[in-house]
Amino acid sequence: MGFTYKDSGVDIDAADLSVQMIKRYARQTHIDGVLGDIGNFGAFFQLDGSLRQPVLVSGADGVGTKLKVAFMMDKHDTVGIDCVAMCVNDILVHGARPLFFLDYIAVGKLIPEKISQIVKGIAEGCTQAGCALIGGETAQMPDMYKEEEYDLAGFAVGVVEREKLLDGSKIKQRDAVIGLASSGLHSNGFSLVRKVLLGKMKVDEYISDLKKTLGEELLTPTKIYVRTVLDVLNDKIHGMAHITGGGLLENLPRILPEGLEFRIDKNSWEVPVIFKIIQRLGKIDSKEMYRTFNMGIGFVMVVERDEVENLLRKLNELGQNAWVIGDIVPGEKGVII
């Protein structure tokens, strides 16, 4: 008997079983507008007819080397939340409400139970963001990845009325900068984290300062800000930023008009313990920390000064810790910390 596709490392039966598992989780995320089910060649979504000038906003991202920690712990049910968060928080910056999400999973060996755990996390992330998981791709690539490893990326599409689209152009001098607390490291800087921490500690080591194991801290899912931010969004909010790779120093200038810069007071919030541990053990310069990690601020809103008290009150009522962390001053499209 000749070779089969399975002999080369690609198991179609396992793929079929995975699709059936994925359908169950995907259906749990369905919202108005979803047409059809997982398994078609394309996925369908019908826009709300009440939108006057809808603008679609899209974003794509991955989880990066945070996945290495998931491999080490053999825990795969939270990285999907990270994947959704990285995408929906990006499009949220522009005032967009996420509508639907698609995932891409590339594996060395397809194990349906592992895929099921990954997609369970993706579905949970979609539920938190109020969007639907409507499709994706699971690619078996036996010579590209080790059998126990995979890569994970996603694609989010949202909608905003054209007149409500935020791009930072309304930001002006004396606007206040509100920082929303992160849940931890989120999904950035893990190559440095692994170099600094995992050479000295084990993922199952209990860290008294963290009150949990190192692995539990590192795998804490990225916070999804969608429902909170959409609840408080109004015309006095002039710009927003998702603090991802590059930290405050690299992400904040992306939304600034010419002739302005951010002035950030790093003493206005308490930097979480995990960042202090990384900085101490790695002997990392403060500037490097602020251009690599979120340092406890996962999302930023730039608002009119007379809106600060009202916005902070609303965020607090929604259970979101937030602080005034700076203001907008004349400058060269940079960040002063």
From Swiss-Prot:
<dbReference type="InterPro" id="IPR036921">
    <property type="entry name" value="PurM-like_N_sf"/>
</dbReference>
<keyword id="KW-0436">Ligase</keyword>
<dbReference type="GO" id="GO:0006189">
    <property type="term" value="P:'de novo' IMP biosynthetic process"/>
</dbReference>
<comment type="similarity">
    <text>Belongs to the AIR synthase family.</text>
</comment>
<keyword id="KW-0658">Purine biosynthesis</keyword>
<keyword id="KW-0547">Nucleotide-binding</keyword>
<keyword id="KW-0067">ATP-binding</keyword>
<dbReference type="GO" id="GO:0046084">
    <property type="term" value="P:adenine biosynthetic process"/>
</dbReference>
<dbReference type="InterPro" id="IPR010918">
    <property type="entry name" value="PurM-like_C_dom"/>
</dbReference>
<dbReference type="InterPro" id="IPR004733">
    <property type="entry name" value="PurM_cligase"/>
</dbReference>
<dbReference type="Pfam" id="PF02769">
    <property type="entry name" value="AIRS_C"/>
</dbReference>
<protein>
    <recommendedName>
        <fullName>Phosphoribosylformylglycinamidine cyclo-ligase</fullName>
        <ecNumber>6.3.3.1</ecNumber>
    </recommendedName>
</protein>
<dbReference type="InterPro" id="IPR036676">
    <property type="entry name" value="PurM-like_C_sf"/>
</dbReference>
<dbReference type="GO" id="GO:0004637">
    <property type="term" value="F:phosphoribosylamine-glycine ligase activity"/>
</dbReference>
<dbReference type="GO" id="GO:0005524">
    <property type="term" value="F:ATP binding"/>
</dbReference>
<dbReference type="InterPro" id="IPR016188">
    <property type="entry name" value="PurM-like_N"/>
</dbReference>
<comment type="pathway">
    <text>Purine metabolism; IMP biosynthesis via de novo pathway; 5-amino-1-(5-phospho-D-ribosyl)imidazole from N(2)-formyl-N(1)-(5-phospho-D-ribosyl)glycinamide: step 2/2.</text>
</comment>
<keyword id="KW-0963">Cytoplasm</keyword>
<dbReference type="GO" id="GO:0005829">
    <property type="term" value="C:cytosol"/>
</dbReference>
<dbReference type="GO" id="GO:0004641">
    <property type="term" value="F:phosphoribosylformylglycinamidine cyclo-ligase activity"/>
</dbReference>
<dbReference type="Pfam" id="PF00586">
    <property type="entry name" value="AIRS"/>
</dbReference>
